[in-house]
Amino acid sequence: MVAILTANGYECVEAICPFNLLKRAGLDVRFVGLNGKTESGSCGVTVECAMTAAELIESGEKIDMLVLPGGLPGATNLDEAPETDKLIEITEKCGGFFAAICAAPMVYGKRGMLKGKTATAYPEFRKYLDGATIAEGNVARDGRFITAAGMGAAFDFGLELIRALKDDETADKISAAVCAK
């Protein structure tokens, strides 16, 4: 299961665009609310979450990928929540992927998870990518870590998530189907 962890103040495009692309790829993707079953984005869009973070933690369900959207104060809310640490721990035990965009890569960076990796984030938040090599482009994938610079990279970020969980062919077909190429 792909868990897109939303917190109040998340960046709408960074959560919804990858969700849409992952659904098109036939993946089991769900919004997981940090604080409740509904979370409000910084742009005013509220998502209905399949479950709360606490419910996912209690379920024992396998997490194939944990996706953290950026936006403020959403990314800060994720960074400060103990539930985020527990979901990181579960994802690690499952051998899953860790993905984050915009300000949210700081969550992994501040926990030392990006040391020795190539990663990116919104320019003002790159200082939190402790020990990482900053990528040249807007999307970086290094092993089980996928990061992106911001809202403008949300589509390419979503395609990279598909490449990680499925393959290049599936990502390319979806890109063509939505008239991106």
Write out the residue ranges for each language-model feature.
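Catalytic cores of processing enzymes, dominated by hydrolases/peptidases
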Residues: 122
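Extended, subdomain-level signal for the structured scaffold at the beginning of enzyme domains
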Residues: 1-97, 107-116, 126-136, 141-181
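Anionic-ligand binding patches
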Residues: 119
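Short, thiol/selenol-centered motifs that function as redox-active sites or metal-ligating centers
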Residues: 101-102
